[in-house]
Curated annotation (Swiss-Prot):
Induction: By 3- or 4-carboxydiphenyl ether and by phenol. Its cofactor is [2Fe-2S] cluster; Fe cation. [2Fe-2S] cluster binds at C85, H87, C104, H107. This dioxygenase system consists of two proteins: the alpha subunit (PobA) and a subunit (PobB) that acts as a ferredoxin and a ferredoxin reductase. Degrades exclusively diarylether compounds having carboxyl groups in the 3- or 4-position. Yields a hemiacetal that spontaneously hydrolyzes to phenol and protocatechuate. GO terms for biological process: catabolic process. Keywords: 2Fe-2S, Aromatic hydrocarbons catabolism, Dioxygenase, Iron, Iron-sulfur, Metal-binding, NAD, Oxidoreductase, Plasmid. CDD domains: Rieske_RO_Alpha_PhDO_like (cd03479). This is Phenoxybenzoate dioxygenase subunit alpha. It comes from Ectopseudomonas oleovorans. Binds 1 [2Fe-2S] cluster.
Length: 409
């Protein structure tokens, strides 16, 4: 006996009753150790804190789904350790930091920043077998005012990259860094861990069309007046990431070319949103805290502080000054991205031609994930200093009839 298949007439097509909820892409959503994306992200150095925030007071940090204790010993060396003491499991968050490392509050076992157990005061001769009680640890290095950790296979540890726009500072220049907040130009938030998936924020870098709608027409002018011009866009897969060129024909006869970059595994390079001309001067890292949170770290080359001051989103108010009704009426990046859910349901998406950059970035990222799964080294990972300088491509460039404007301080 054949099964009767109900026919839905046009009047009832699209009923929510018939909707089958989608699901996140499992290859992209999970960041824990052993997952495809988790192992991919662990092959790169990840910022975990501002250098200035790492002191001799232990602090808990959560990165890539792991809870860890971060501190700086009295000799000035940062350390990142598994928090449960290898003696009987007490948290090293309650430890005291000394010249050589961190001492557990319970029975006084002392661990160096590389996890070596240096002293067991209740044991004969300070612990005859203390070398067997090594505390799990991750290597850390400091650069650009940030503390970076490598959380991948030890035998695959790359050199810490350098970025050309943050190198060879001229007299009077310095690097300004911040952490937290859902986007570099918005308010800092009390909890630096933003409550949704890191990829929802990072892939936004390759979506120039949302700037035309969300930031320029739907919610009024949130950035610069010329963003309300619909651009012509070209996306390009490059070694180490994806970039786009967006061209706008301005009313004064000039043409504006804007270049954004998304670099593996989670780096963004965006020029000034006031559209001032010249090479971009800052980069950001969109670091996965876990599957449902991320944290931003940003570094800017500058001569003046205040590069990350909050913008005025509406009626002269910054984001934290807006009421909930104003955020509903004039949403920005946080509302659009958090509105997708803690982890978006990729299975429900209907990507269109304007999503070419998103599709390209995801496809390129999946290729890098596959390389890691096959035992290879993903793009942007290098094992000698000579190859570790990364060229950043971003900027606002104005073309006139006789020249291109490129410089701005």
């Amino acid at each position: 006996m054949s099964k009767t298949i109900p026919i839905v007439d046009a009047q009832h097509a699209g009923s929510a009753y018939q909707h089958v909820p989608g699901h996140p892409d499992p290859q992209l959503s999970a960041v824990a150790k052993g997952t495809p994306t988790g192992e991919y992200l662990r092959r790169y150095w990840q910022p975990v804190a501002l250098s200035a925030d790492v002191t001799d007071r232990p602090q808990m940090v959560r990165i890539l789904g792991e809870d860890l204790v971060l501190f700086r010993d009295k000799a000035g060396r940062p350390g990142l350790l598994y928090p449960r003491c290898m003696h009987r499991g007490t948290s090293l968050y309650y430890g005291h930091v000394e010249e050589a490392g961190i001492r557990c509050c319970y029975h006084g076992w002392l661990f160096a920043v590389d996890g070596t157990c240096l002293n067991q005061p209740c044991e004969p001769e300070g612990g005859l077998r203390r070398e067997a009680a090594r505390q799990p640890w991750y290597p850390v290095e400091e650069r650009y005012g940030l503390v970076f950790a490598y959380m991948g296979p030890p035998e695959k540890k790359p050199v810490l990259p350098r970025y050309d726009i943050l190198e060879d500072l001229e007299e009077g220049e310095f690097i300004e860094v911040i952490s937290g907040g859902f986007v570099s130009y918005a308010d800092h938030v009390e909890d630096p861990n933003v409550p949704y998936h890191w990829l929802q924020n990072w892939e936004n870098i390759m979506d120039p069309y949302h700037v035309y709608i969300l930031h320029s027409t739907f919610s009024g002018i949130q950035f610069a007046e010329n963003f309300k011009i619909l651009p012509r866009v070209d996306f390009e897969a490059v070694d180490g990431g994806v970039i786009y060129h967006a061209w706008r024909d301005l009313e004064d006869g000039r043409q504006l070319e804007r270049i954004n970059s998304a670099l593996f595994p989670n780096i963004s390079a965006i020029p000034m949103i006031d559209l001032s001309p010249g090479q971009g001067r800052w980069i950001g890292w969109h670091v996965a805290v876990d599957d449902q949170h991320y944290r931003g770290f940003f570094a800017a080359r500058t001569r003046q502080p205040g590069n990350f001051a909050p913008i005025k989103m509406h009626n002269g108010k910054s984001w934290t000054e807006l009421s909930e009704q104003e955020k509903q009426d004039f949403p920005g990046d946080f509302e659009a991205q958090f509105g997708q859910g803690r982890v978006t349901l990729h299975g429900e998406e209907h990507l269109a031609t304007s999503d070419h950059g998103i599709a390209l970035l995801r496809r390129q990222m999946k290729q890098q994930i596959a390389i890691v799964q096959q035992g290879g080294d993903p793009a942007g990972v290098h094992f000698n200093e000579a190859d570790a300088l990364v060229r950043i491509r971003s900027g606002n460039f104005y073309t006139t009839s006789d020249k291109t404007e490129t410089a701005a301080d």
